[in-house]
Structures are given as structure tokens and as C-alpha cells.
């Protein structure tokens, strides 16, 4: 009888040990899955927003944005840089500089200061009218084509076809303008 009781106790202990081991493995796997989900919720959760000046809602997360958001931001940056007069150029360029990374602001300040000086000296007014917009959200790239009308003093407007490429990055909930460049268009 001692022999049978001892085997029965060993079996119960073995089954209990296996059961506890299975519970520990399940608990660890659930904790890992929960940790991954928490990370994704914290960094990849998208918020849908509809701004005042635009009709199309957009979605943003901590480190990414959809095509609609990138398009609207790029059009806002274009307006801040190109829809200016001698009275508004300083305020517009100052607002644009807030979206440039702090390390690149000095270079952009020089470019914008030269533009502002020419605009003020020649009493220039300009307006940009977009004709097409293409967005690549995975790269943060926005290409905008349009017509730039420029008035110098009281003259008739000069019309130029322009093609701009803007690179936008979204990091830690902040949108940065990495590049604001003009490219030559072969279709002129």
C-alpha cells in the first residue's frame, strides 16, 4: 500500500508541475502579446481630424500621417511661402520656420531672408494657384504643380509654371518640413 500511495503522490505532483508550467508559459505569452499591443496603441494609434479650412478629414498617428494630411500641410506650407506681399512676408516666413527642424533653420532663415528682402525692395505680391498635387505617404513626399502669379509694384502679373517638392516627416507627434524645393518641369 505504501508503494501505491507513493506512486499516486508522484503522479499528482507531476501533473501539478506540468499544469503550473503550462500556466507560466501561457502567462508569459499573454504578457508579451499585451506588451506588443500596448506599444502599437501608444505609437501607431491614428486620430481622425477635420481642420477648419479644409473639408477632407485626415488621420495621423505618433509617427505617421495619411495622404490627405500630407497634402493639406504641404498646401499650407506653399501658401506661407508663396502667397505673400511686402506687408505679410515676415509673418508668413516666421510661421513657416516653426515647421523646419531646429538644426536646419539657420540655412532656411538665410534663404527666406533673401526672398523677403527682394519682396520688400521691389514691392512684390505673389499668389500660387495649384493645378495638381501628388502625394506619396510612405515617403512623406508631396509634389505640387501650379501657376505662380507675381505682381511687381502696379504692373501686370507675371505668370510662371512652378513645380515644388516637399518632404514632410512626422516624428513623436510633430510634423517637420525636411525639404522645400523647386524643380524644373520639362513640360513648360
Curated annotation (Swiss-Prot):
Pfam families in the cross-refs: TraE (PF05309)
Designated gene of the protein: traE
Protein name: Protein TraE
Task of the protein: Involved in F pilus assembly.
Keywords: Conjugation, Plasmid
Listed NCBIfam families: TraE_TIGR
Stretches that traverse the bilayer: none
Family of the protein in this entry: Belongs to the TraE family.
Highest taxon of source: Bacteria
Disulfide bond sites: none
Keyword tRNA processing: no
Coiled-coil annotated residue ranges, if any: none
Amino acid at each position: 500500500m505504501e508503494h501505491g500511495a507513493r506512486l499516486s503522490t508522484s503522479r499528482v505532483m507531476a501533473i501539478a508541475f506540468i499544469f503550473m508550467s503550462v500556466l507560466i508559459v501561457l502567462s508569459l505569452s499573454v504578457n508579451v502579446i499585451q506588451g506588443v499591443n500596448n506599444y502599437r496603441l501608444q505609437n501607431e494609434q491614428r486620430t481622425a481630424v477635420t481642420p477648419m479650412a479644409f473639408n477632407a478629414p485626415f488621420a495621423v498617428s505618433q509617427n505617421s500621417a495619411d495622404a490627405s494630411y500630407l497634402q493639406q500641410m504641404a498646401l499650407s506650407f506653399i501658401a506661407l511661402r508663396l502667397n505673400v506681399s511686402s506687408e505679410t512676408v515676415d509673418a508668413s516666413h516666421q510661421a513657416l520656420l516653426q515647421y523646419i527642424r531646429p538644426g536646419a533653420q539657420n540655412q532656411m532663415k538665410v534663404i527666406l531672408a533673401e526672398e523677403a528682402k527682394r519682396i520688400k525692395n521691389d514691392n512684390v505680391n505673389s499668389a500660387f494657384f495649384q493645378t495638381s498635387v501628388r502625394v506619396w505617404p510612405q515617403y512623406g513626399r508631396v509634389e505640387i504643380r501650379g501657376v505662380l502669379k507675381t505682381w511687381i509694384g502696379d504692373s501686370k502679373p507675371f505668370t510662371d509654371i512652378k513645380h515644388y517638392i516637399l518632404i514632410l516627416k512626422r516624428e513623436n507627434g510633430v510634423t517637420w518640413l525636411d525639404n522645400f524645393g523647386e524643380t524644373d518641369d520639362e513640360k513648360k
